[in-house]
């Protein structure tokens, strides 16, 4: 969402057309954006190098070229991303995860990264049979646990200590930012007026749960993990891992809840079969168990992630989020 009520910027795709484009939704009127983005000055030139595969208008974009990925940032922000990538090369266990190598930093807003071959776990759902799908998720779970648990050597420990803190307090602040932005964007929509109280009540409970129980220990966190950022590989080859802009020190529940919520979202929107969901969900819960994540912390971060999805201008998304939160609250009260 933009700051002005009723205005959104979107990433959209067109059936039969490769890649994605940016679009604006303003007061119910949809319009595709031109290839020039005033806050991403490198976009027009770099987009000609390949296929635009990810685009958050005014913020960042990713172009897939023949043997590399080109990431375009707002002016001056490429340096931070380059530093994060170098840090993760030290922090991550090379036997478990590969990270893209920086091939060039052509300007303060453009970085070219090496490509990691293989489908993402998201793509595996549509390309692999059940056995391969289950194996890919089991491989991720088994690699994730020791990576988060450590122990780390002195260099990796130093990197971990230098990362920003993503605390439960920060997550609660994000919850309220999401809710307040939704209130602002929908203040003049009569049909949604009765839902304002329900949303505010949900936010109060989510924030209370985040802050009301003792946090789990701080560990390394990707910060925004989902299955489109995990590259599946065969045999003993390490998995690939992408996008470290939000990497931080946080509770293990932050990443595990994020992965799990996106899986359940696809299930509820009929974009994943129940059997495939159960397979992947079981491996997430296996990691939760092995990392000794307090179930209350996992539920708190899961609810926060669900609430963050409420602000997307997609038909049925807001009501789905409220229904999911109410359903999970009732199930926990019933002890199921």
Where are these regions (language model features)?
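Active-site acidic catalytic loop and adjacent metal/ATP-binding pocket
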Residues: 52, 61-65, 70, 207-254
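An alpha-helical support segment within catalytic cores of ATP-dependent transferases
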Residues: 43-49, 149-222, 233, 288-290, ...
């Amino acid at each position: 969402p933009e700051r002005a009520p009723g205005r959104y910027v979107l990433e959209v795709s067109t059936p039969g057309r490769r890649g994605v484009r940016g679009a604006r939704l303003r007061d119910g009127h949809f319009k595709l954006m031109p290839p020039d983005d005033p806050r991403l000055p490198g976009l027009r030139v770099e987009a000609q190098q390949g296929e635009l595969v990810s685009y958050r208008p005014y913020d960042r974009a990713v172009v897939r070229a023949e043997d590399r990925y080109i990431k375009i940032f707002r002016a001056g922000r490429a340096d931070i991303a380059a530093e994060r990538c170098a840090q993760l090369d030290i922090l991550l266990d090379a036997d478990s995860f590969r990270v893209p190598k920086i091939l060039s930093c052509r300007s303060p807003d453009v970085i070219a990264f090496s490509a990691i071959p293989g489908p993402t776990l998201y793509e595996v759902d549509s390309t692999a049979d059940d056995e391969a799908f289950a194996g890919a998720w089991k491989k991720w779970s088994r690699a994730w646990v020791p990576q988060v648990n450590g122990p780390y050597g002195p260099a990796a420990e130093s990197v971990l200590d230098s990362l920003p803190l993503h605390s439960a307090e920060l997550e609660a602040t994000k919850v309220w930012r999401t809710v307040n932005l939704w209130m602002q964007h929908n203040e003049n929509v009569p049909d949604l007026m009765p839902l304002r109280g329900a949303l505010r009540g949900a936010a109060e409970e989510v924030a209370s749960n985040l802050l009301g129980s003792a946090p789990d220990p701080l560990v390394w966190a990707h910060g925004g993990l989902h299955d489109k950022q995990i590259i599946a590989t065969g045999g003993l080859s390490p998995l690939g891992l992408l996008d470290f802009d939000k990497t931080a020190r946080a509770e293990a529940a932050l990443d595990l809840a994020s992965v799990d919520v996106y899986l359940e979202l696809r299930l509820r929107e009929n974009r994943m079969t129940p059997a495939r969901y159960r397979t992947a969900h079981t491996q997430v819960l296996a990691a939760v168990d092995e990392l000794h994540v307090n179930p209350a912390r996992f539920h708190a971060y899961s609810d926060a992630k669900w609430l963050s999805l409420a602000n997307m201008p997609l038909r049925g998304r807001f009501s789905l989020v409220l229904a999911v939160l109410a359903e999970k609250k009732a199930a926990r009260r019933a002890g199921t």
